[in-house]
């Protein structure tokens, strides 16, 4: 890794989720490269930063996972405001929401105001599981089958790296082609947008489903940060207040901005 030789990128806010430290599928080297190269005024950790579920099944904690946490905590000491909104895989941290862990702020949820005065609800997203009807296939995918898929994903990408090809998400490819999975994603997005609408906010930022997205749903801005297992993505608010998705490519760890969606700037909520 050559993070020190690459230019530093300055942004206003960065939102990342679903890193899953403690899991073998975590792309910790890319998370670390991202954190070292991107200088942000505010860093939002939108849940599932540490995968306690995976650690309980089989303890796995290499040095690079420590390095990620140290880098995050280091940012709190050098001018970055870090706001942590725990998810379902690190739900133990929800017991101390509303407190400070050093300079790290821990919240059950948070309302972020962009430079363009858009008010965005920030929450992990597992809160919507009860409102979404999951099929049997998705229930299995969320446990054993999903673990198998990610294992296959790791092998496929090891081969692709040897052949000089960039990272490709097998799990994401399969989910995008299964009707029930897409129905679940649609229901999740609608439930998330409704949560922001009920509070008269302009939009919502969440994670949980490992599917990065920026779109407008009936006047509500829906943003999903994605993950660092499959997508290796982050939601970025640039210094002008514009939101976009970034994907961190392991082919030289090159930064790739996702195409900007056709979403108009939303008016500030009354």
Model-based region annotation:
Residues 123-188:
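Active-site-proximal loop/helix segment associated with metal-binding centers of metalloenzymes
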Residues 103-109, 121, 126, 130-140, ...:
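Conserved beta-sheet core of the metallophosphoesterase superfamily
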Residues 4-12, 23-115:
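Core catalytic region of metal-dependent phosphoesterases/phosphodiesterases
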Residues 13-15, 43-45, 121, 205:
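Residue-level marker for buried hydrophobic side chains located in beta-strands
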Residues 54-56, 93-96, 132-133, 214-216, ...:
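Short glycine-/acidic-enriched loop or helix-start segments at secondary-structure transitions
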Residues 3, 248-270:
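C-terminal regulatory/interaction regions
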Residues 23, 28-29, 116-122, 128, ...:
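Catalytic core of the metallo-beta-lactamase
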